[in-house]
Amino acid sequence: MQVLVRDNNVDQALRALKKKMQREGIFREMKMRGHYEKPSEKRAREKAEAVRRARKLARKRAQREGLIGGRTGAR
C-alpha cells in the first residue's frame, strides 16, 4: 500500500494511509487475527453478521418506501 507524501507533510500522509487501511479492512483483520477463532465460532459470527446486515437492509428499504420513519433522536 502506497501513500504520497507532499511537501514533507507526514501527518497528512499518515491520515491518508489510515483511511486507506480502514477502507481495506486491515484493522478489522488484525483484530480478528489477534487470537485464534474456532471454525464453529467463525461460522456463528459470520451468520450473526449476515443477520445484522439483512435486518439493516430491510430497515433501510422500509424507510425508503415510507413504511417507517427515519431516526429523529426523539423518544
From Swiss-Prot:
GO terms for cellular component: ribonucleoprotein complex; ribosome. NCBIfam families: S21p. It comes from the Bacteria. GO terms for molecular function: structural constituent of ribosome. Signal peptide: none annotated. Keywords: Ribonucleoprotein, Ribosomal protein. Belongs to the bacterial ribosomal protein bS21 family. This is Small ribosomal subunit protein bS21. GO terms for biological process: translation.
